Amino acid sequence: MTLATAAPIARPCVVCIPARNEEERLPILLASLAGQEGFAAEAPLRVVILANNCTDGTVPAIRALEDAGALASLTLRVIEAALEGAEAHVGTARRMALDAGAAWLEDEGAPDGILLTTDADARLPADWVASNLRALRAADVVGGRLVIDADRAADPRLAELHARIERYWAGVRRLEDILDPPPHDPAPRHGDHTGASLAVPVALYRAVGGLPPLPCGEDNALVSLLRESGARLRHCPDVRVMVSARHQGRVSGGMATEMARRARVLDGEPYLLPEAAHWRTLILRRATLRRAFHLAGSARAEACARLGLGPDACAALETCPNDIAFVERADRILESRSAPARECPLDRALADLDALALSLREAA
């Protein structure tokens, strides 16, 4: 499908991007946004860029693309901000970008519009916006799959490591499908819901108080708030984003930190992940909580008590609108009391996951 033949996007939306010193990568992202299916000069895609604390040519690079006519299918709002002190981080910048996007849609009379966010160093397939909106027909929030946009000259051992790590997380989801399959997020699905690709309606974003302005993990914190409100999170395999494989990033604990960790594995550092038994315990606990929600009166309280939830916790959980919210809120309480997961090297973790899945299937 080409831009000339693509059906126009019916639901109003805006893409919200925090950017700091991204004069090289941001033009690549903007080019991929300008090529999104369903948008054209007469029906442009709204984009907010929060350029924070930039000391390079990030904003001039944007203006150069505009002057060249390369962004005709976009309506751009570039906000320059100088964040200070403890607020000078990606959490504040992403919050400001999303808030600006929400206000834009509300001002245009579209409070039912959709906020999408991605990273300034990402690259998007042409159907990214359309795939998000399709997935939202049966969900409240959509997370996109992260595909590492690796350098072709990178060590092939690194690509093999990426594949093994992905297989580990696919194995965790396979356990979930066997023990407690989520009806709102059926297989096939991925497991990513980060700021590199997230879609949420404006009204729902406002209802949970917006994105927590944390220096790291702001995206996961927002998703937690959404799930605890009862939102159906979909990990649609059709929604994907290419993310940078660079080792030097803007955030400690972000994607660049993970890429640097993986690079060290090639030098002999072990890559440790939770043992399979941890996931089995966690999934079964969440399954028990899900069943408990549908029990009435004292039966629910008794089921919660067996898991270690006292009367006060049970009373607080009475306000949960559905089983999604109940499981997320109750599990947060229980997880805070749990010991850290035991970890083991990647190869053993993979073997244990495969063996556990096989034994569960044979026992079914």
Where in the sequence are the language-model features?
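N-proximal low-complexity "stem/linker" segments adjacent to membrane-targeting elements
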Residues: 1-43
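Conserved donor NDP-sugar-binding/catalytic core segment of glycosyltransferases
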Residues: 127-164
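Short, flexible, basic/aromatic active-site loop/helix in glycosyltransferases
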Residues: 162-190
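Acidic donor-binding segment of Leloir-type glycosyltransferases
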Residues: 31-86
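Conserved nucleotide-sugar donor-binding
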Residues: 192-208
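Terminal low-complexity segments of carbohydrate-biosynthetic enzymes
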Residues: 261-364
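Acidic donor-binding/catalytic loop of UDP-sugar-dependent glycosyltransferases
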Residues: 57, 110-134
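Acidic donor-binding loop at a coil-to-helix junction in glycosyltransferase catalytic cores
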Residues: 216-222, 236
